[in-house]
Amino acid sequence: MRIIALLVLAVAVSACVKDKSSIDEVVGSDNISGYVSLYDDGVGKVDDSGMTVTVEGATPAVSAVTDAKGYFILPELRYGTYTLVYSKAGYGTYKRHNVDHTVELGGTFITPTPSLGQLAKASVVSASASVVGSEVKLSVSTSPAGSMANTVYLRFFLSKNKEVSSTTYMYHSANYISNMNPFVFTIQKSELESFGYTAGTTVYFRVYADGFWSNDYLNPETGRMVFPNLNLTTPAPGSFVVP
């Protein structure tokens, strides 16, 4: 009986040693690296250097600055899940959440390479709504004016809340290309219904100028998209009633 007990103990000790060994293999560190591709507020390519990539919440702080090729390396980070913050003067701050840093030959390489643009230089100076049949038309003027020689990018936000903004909204549009002034968004009644707005509902809207590259990302805490490159100079919210 004693021999059997000793054998069981030996097996248990052996299992513990194996478990500890596997944990030790995972608890380690390596580099996180990657590239950025930088643009102006349109589609013009610019120098990729000078963007700071920071590990959010790291103590002590961990960051790196991109070189002329847009390359950065964050050395010897312990394995885990991280949020990387990309920032540079003139650019909306971009965040990459849930970077899974695990055992990989050569460390963790960030893919795909983010294309990041500058803050929108244009701004919205007026925005009004009109209902025509089963359509809602949002007429938007910008400064400088959109034209064939000067492309402007626009995005609108909708809500039942009169305080609608780029951070408080129920619906956000795609990024529209404007080569005219004013630019008119046409929203069909069927689209509004698909957004959750029924006939007779008062809907509040707000329009912002954006960059071609929005530097947008999903905020996992709010479940909303964040649009860092919007020019926040814009008129107060307007409204319309769903036809």
PLM feature spans:
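Bacterial Sec-dependent N-terminal signal peptides
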Residues: 1-40
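Extracellular beta-sheet/turn segments enriched in Thr/Pro/Gly and aliphatic residues
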Residues: 22, 102-126, 239-243
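Short, ordered, surface-exposed loop/turn motifs in non-cytosolic proteins
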Residues: 30-32, 39-58, 149-152
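Solvent-exposed loop/turn segments flanking beta-strands in beta-repeat/beta-sandwich domains
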Residues: 43-49, 145-169
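Short, acidic Ser/Thr/Gly-rich low-complexity loop/linker segments typical of extracellular
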Residues: 58-71
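A short, solvent-exposed beta-strand micro-motif common in secreted/extracellular proteins
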Residues: 70, 80-96, 208
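Structured interaction patches on ligand/partner-binding surfaces of diverse proteins
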Residues: 89-113, 213-232
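Beta-strand-rich modules
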Residues: 192-219
